[in-house]
């Protein structure tokens, strides 16, 4: 019961494709270890610590610009 040539080529191409996707995924994970949490060495300080980006002081929510009361007037539709 020998495996056909097409089956072996299909398995080899599947292996190459999976290897490509693993490299792409590990490249995205490497970005976290370069900067963010735990001092840049890729480790977290505590077991329960999560990587959270610091919020800038001048960061303003857009909600303030959407809902405004102008001259305390009511608008009826």
Curated annotation (Swiss-Prot):
Instruction: Name the source's superkingdom.
Output: Eukaryota
- Signal peptide range equals 1-29
Instruction: Please give the positions of the paired cysteines in each disulfide bond.
Output: 37-51
GO terms (molecular function) for this protein are: hormone activity
What cellular component terms from Gene Ontology apply here?
A: apoplast
For this UniProt record, the keywords arranged alphabetically read as follows: Disulfide bond, Hormone, Secreted, Signal
Chief location of this protein? Answer: secreted
Its GO biological process annotations read: calcium-mediated signaling; cell-cell signaling
**Which locations, inside or outside the cell, does it occupy?**
Secreted
Function of the protein:
Cell signaling peptide that may regulate plant stress, growth, and development. Mediates a rapid alkalinization of extracellular space by mediating a transient increase in the cytoplasmic Ca(2+) concentration leading to a calcium-dependent signaling events through a cell surface receptor and a concomitant activation of some intracellular mitogen-activated protein kinases.
Q: Please state which protein family the record places this protein in.
A: Belongs to the plant rapid alkalinization factor (RALF) family.
- Name of protein: Protein RALF-like 17
In the UniProt record, what gene is named as encoding this protein?
RALFL17
